[in-house]
Amino acid sequence: MFYIHLENTFDLSSTILVKLPEAYAIFDPIVDVMPIIPLFFFLLAFVWQASVSFR
């Protein structure tokens, strides 16, 4: 069962590294930045709490 889990993980990681189809090539820079967007929300939470003095 553990082997199957590892096999699926490798399949997922190889799919993430696939290039976009040619029709969507213009969105490639946006797609490169998209995984970072949740980090901005995480940092925004700290800025928000700092502005209200970490109540």
Swiss-Prot record:
Q: Topology versus the membrane, per the UniProt entry? A: Single-pass membrane protein
Q: What family does the database annotate?
A: Belongs to the PsbK family.
Q: Does the keyword Membrane apply?
A: yes
Keywords for this protein: Chloroplast, Membrane, Photosynthesis, Photosystem II, Plastid, Reaction center, Thylakoid, Transmembrane, Transmembrane helix
Briefly, what is this protein's role? One of the components of the core complex of photosystem II (PSII). PSII is a light-driven water:plastoquinone oxidoreductase that uses light energy to abstract electrons from H(2)O, generating O(2) and a proton gradient subsequently used for ATP formation. It consists of a core antenna complex that captures photons, and an electron transfer chain that converts photonic excitation into a charge separation.
Record's subcellular location: Plastid, Chloroplast thylakoid membrane
Pro-segment residues? 1-18
Recorded hits in InterPro entries, A to Z, give:
PSII_PsbK, PSII_PsbK_sf
Q: What single Pfam family name could you report for this chain, choosing any that match? A: PsbK
Using the UniProt record, give the first listed, main subcellular location: plastid
HAMAP family documented for this protein: PSII_PsbK (MF_00441)
* Record GO biological process: photosynthesis
Quaternary structure (record): PSII is composed of 1 copy each of membrane proteins PsbA, PsbB, PsbC, PsbD, PsbE, PsbF, PsbH, PsbI, PsbJ, PsbK, PsbL, PsbM, PsbT, PsbX, PsbY, PsbZ, Psb30/Ycf12, at least 3 peripheral proteins of the oxygen-evolving complex and a large number of cofactors. It forms dimeric complexes.
Q: Which residues cross the membrane?
A: 26-46
Annotated GO CC locations: chloroplast thylakoid membrane; photosystem II reaction center
Protein name as it appears in the record: Photosystem II reaction center protein K
Q: Keyword Plastid: yes or no?
A: yes
